[in-house]
Regions:
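Short, flexible active-site-adjacent loop segments at beta-strand->alpha-helix junctions, enriched
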Residues: 110, 155, 164-167
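Compositionally biased, intrinsically disordered low-complexity segments enriched
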Residues: 4, 37, 113, 166-168
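Acidic, histidine-bearing metal-coordination/catalytic regions of metal-dependent phosphoesterases
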Residues: 1-27
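Core catalytic region of metal-dependent phosphoesterases/phosphodiesterases
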Residues: 25-27, 31, 36-153
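Alpha/beta-hydrolase fold active-site loops
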Residues: 26, 158-160
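Generic hydrophobic, helix-prone segments enriched in Leu/Val/Ile
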Residues: 1-2, 10, 59, 84, ...
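Active-site-proximal loop/helix segment associated with metal-binding centers of metalloenzymes
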Residues: 160-215
Length: 215
């Protein structure tokens, strides 16, 4: 059944998860589906970036650990990671601040599923920007992008399982290359006309309900 296959895909995401402690002293801030783009009309993150930066500064100063649960980068509509980094330089600097402090971890989603390739972090995330002296600065060297994170409850053994969630949907998991093609060449142009992407559970209530029922 579809439910059984969804369960298998979700279980697979937790075969080699990142394990983090959960107790009365740990503090986590969770972000998902930022979909950082290249600054064009389809960049849904752009208008919220100031709020994002303000919240990251607040949570950093208060000792939180940053968890990004997938689709941080819109790599279905856009091909260039470099352009995304250039457009949202301040956001990347803020994340780098957490990472340098050992307080940033990331899960890949369907729209940035290419991050699961081992060479991808080395190519795109080792360095990020140039400072005022034109010296290239480190971003997140040796970063790992996980399929899932488990917060291990050290008090009541009630662990919290974190993943992006696309594993529950066949079109956005196993058939993601097809979905990317449809988004990049069909739904992206139509979105500019105000027509929502039907492959997205976030923009399609019927798909959203079905995905939630499978989890």
């Amino acid at each position: 059944s579809q439910f059984s296959f969804s369960h298998l895909r979700i279980s697979k995401a937790f075969r080699e998860p990142l394990l983090l402690p959960l107790n009365c002293h740990t503090k986590y801030i969770l972000f998902s589906d930022c979909h950082r783009g290249v600054g064009n009309a389809n960049d849904n993150f752009l208008k919220n970036e100031y709020l994002y930066l303000a919240s990251l500064d607040y949570y950093y100063r208060n000792g939180f650990t940053y968890l990004e649960l997938g689709d941080g980068y819109e790599l279905w509509e856009n091909r260039s990671v470099r352009k995304i980094k250039e457009m949202h330089l301040q956001s990347f600097k803020a994340i780098s601040r957490y990472y340098t402090a050992g307080r940033a971890y990331s899960v890949y989603g369907n729209h940035d599923i290419v991050k699961r390739k081992s060479r991808f972090p080395r190519t795109h995330f080792h360095t990020c920007y140039y400072d005022e002296t034109l010296t290239e600065c480190l971003f997140c060297p040796d970063i790992t992008f996980y399929s899932g994170i488990i917060l291990k409850d050290q008090l009541q053994q009630k662990d919290i399982y974190l993943l992006h969630g696309h594993q529950a949907d066949l079109l956005n998991s196993t058939l993601w290359p097809l979905s990317r093609f449809l988004v990049r060449y069909i739904w992206r142009p139509l979105e500019k006309l105000g027509i929502p992407d039907p492959t997205s559970a976030a923009k399609n209530n019927r798909r959203k309900k079905k995905s939630e029922e499978r989890r």
